[in-house]
Amino acid sequence: MVSKQAFLFSLGSLYLSLLFIFLLMDVYARPANNSALKVETKEKATDNKDENEILPPDHLNGVKMEMDGHLNKEFHQEVFLGKELEEFDEDSEPRRNRRKLAAIFAKVDRNEDKQISASEMQRWIMEKTEEHFQEAVNENKLHFRAVDPDGDGHVSWDEYKIKFLASKGFNEKEVAEKLKNNEDLKIDEETQEVLDNLKDRWFQADNPPPDQLLNEEEFLSFLHPEHSRGMLKFMVKEIIRDLDQDGDKKLTLSEFISLPVGTVENQQAQDIDDDWVRDRKKEYEEVIDANHDGIVTMEELEEYMDPMNEYNALNEAKQMIAVADENQDHLLSLEEILKYSEYFTGSKLMDYARNVHEEF
């Protein structure tokens, strides 16, 4: 006969088991999303690539400055190699890359005199910049379809907002329902700040007369401000706003070279800081400050940022030649370009001198 103590112990164990089962049932029976904006599973968020398609990129190929005001470290390679930039990497076979570079040299050397002049380099830079422009146009067609599912050729701010939040892992259907019913959206502070900035940019891209809708061309300007004079001005204002410390809507040298917030105090960080200051000081004094009065205005920065400015392209051509022009004849030979390949391609093609004559 079972003792009273054993019976009570068995009853207690059964109770705990049932309680555990009920708790599990409660968890799995709950809605997958208590609030309309609760983040979905990591797998789903990771698989969602829409964010890269619908967010304006920080980096713009062929533009001298990033959206955050940093100098574009790959600008020289982008305007010299165009779409072939990705083919030149550190792991590529040097002999193959030398041949690629020689083929590019032949294309730039329009008069076939075995030398590249400033005017030839200028023409080439404009062609490569146009190549980047066309690439952005082609990509925009795909990105626009992602935010225009009904295919009516126009996208409202709310439609874009839904897609943006979905790209962040929020439930798209529930967000759409909340917006439709004018219900509050519970969004974290960081995401809301991004949305506010995007909204300002959205309405700037809405060409007059404003209808709060973006067509495909306006959406291109939204993603790529370098394609629109009006959006280029907006981009310049944003950069000056972030760098201008005294609120005069102009940039002094000290404002332009100010170190990024949160600099780490160690030797490696100090070396990075030194590079930052040196590069920005050189660019400010030699290029951006066109009249060399020690002040950069919005107009000067706008001209500097314009990738289709032929005068800028000529200046860039002269600078690129000066870097590798060892004999100071204001022209570039194939040997000089190969020797300074790291500047033009981002890859150092080793043993160029030993191989150049036997290959070319």
From Swiss-Prot:
SUPFAM superfamilies: EF-hand. One of its GO terms (cellular component) is Golgi lumen. Ca(2+) 2 binds at D148, D150, D152, H154, E159. Ca(2+) 3 binds at D244, D246, D248, K250, E255. It is found in: Golgi apparatus lumen. May regulate calcium-dependent activities in the endoplasmic reticulum lumen or post-ER compartment. PANTHER family: 45 KDA CALCIUM-BINDING PROTEIN (PTHR10827:SF98), RETICULOCALBIN (PTHR10827). This is 45 kDa calcium-binding protein.
